[in-house]
């Protein structure tokens, strides 16, 4: 879901090779050139920018819901258009480790120290759970500053699931955290093209690794 990135054509080619039985859907905007994209495509109207604060929250809400309506599958991987997930066994990893009532997400961008910060780089879950997460979100109005991943996770946990317990006590009730590098094997276009962004993520990831066992309580898995 997202804009047509420089990497998107290659990402789709790899996904077709790695997941030959998967139904691949691109959910993007009616302003994007999709002439070279070889998969099912849904184009939506861009949301109006919010004021005084703006971010990609409403873009994700519109784009993901449009994609979910198109897909008829039991297990769905929601991912970005500028980011490879190289692990060919990512669905097996989900089946073997993630409870069916949880969403599998990367550790990078997820923390117990910042309430409701659950990474939105990608999500892997049953269709039922992903639809619960995305179908019940009020659009962000821009009246206050908040990151998309926090807005989305808080809406799901607090507004939909009606759970107001402390985040550090309940995060693992709704999300199954796996490793960004060794489990998902993610390669991110922004890391390749923006040194400042790469440095920021590297620092954050190093800090999370330091306290990984204490914070996330997950098993480690390594493939290829």
Cite the ranges covered by each PLM segment.
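Short, well-formed alpha-helical segments that are part of the catalytic scaffolds
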Residues: 3-18
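Soluble or luminal CAZymes and related metallo-dependent hydrolases
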Residues: 3-7, 55-66, 144-151
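Acidic metal-phosphate-binding loop of nucleotide-sugar-dependent transferases
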Residues: 79-85
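Short aromatic/hydrophobic "clamp" motif used to bind/position activated sugar donors
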Residues: 76
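Short loop->beta transition adjacent to catalytic acidic/histidine clusters or analogous donor-positioning motifs
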Residues: 15-26, 39
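Active-site-proximal specificity loops/subdomain of glycosyltransferases
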Residues: 26-70
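Short alpha-helix within the catalytic core of nucleotide-sugar-dependent glycosyltransferases
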Residues: 9-12, 73, 87-96
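Catalytic core and acceptor-binding pocket of nucleotide-sugar-dependent glycosyltransferases
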Residues: 85-91, 103-224
């Amino acid at each position: 879901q997202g804009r047509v990135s420089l990497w998107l054509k290659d990402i789709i080619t790899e996904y077709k090779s790695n997941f030959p039985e998967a139904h691949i859907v691109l959910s993007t905007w009616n302003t994007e050139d999709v002439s070279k994209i070889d998969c099912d495509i849904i184009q939506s109207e861009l949301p109006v920018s919010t004021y005084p604060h703006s971010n990609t929250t409403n873009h994700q809400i519109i784009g993901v819901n449009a994609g979910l309506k198109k897909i008829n599958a039991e297990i769905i991987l929601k991912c970005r258009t500028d980011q490879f997930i190289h692990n060919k066994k990512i669905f097996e990893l989900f089946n073997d480790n993630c409870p069916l009532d949880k969403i599998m997400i990367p550790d990078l961008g997820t923390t117990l120290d910042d309430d409701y910060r659950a990474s939105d780089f990608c999500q892997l879950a049953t269709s039922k759970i992903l639809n619960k997460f995305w179908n019940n979100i009020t659009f962000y109005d821009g009246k206050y500053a908040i990151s998309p991943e926090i807005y989305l996770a808080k809406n799901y946990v607090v507004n939909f699931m009606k759970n107001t317990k402390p985040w550090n006590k309940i995060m693992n009730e709704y999300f199954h955290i796996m490793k960004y590098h060794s489990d998902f094997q993610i390669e991110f276009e922004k890391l390749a093209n923006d040194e400042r962004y790469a440095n920021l993520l590297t620092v954050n990831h190093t800090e999370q690794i330091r306290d990984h066992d204490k914070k996330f309580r997950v098993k480690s898995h390594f493939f290829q």
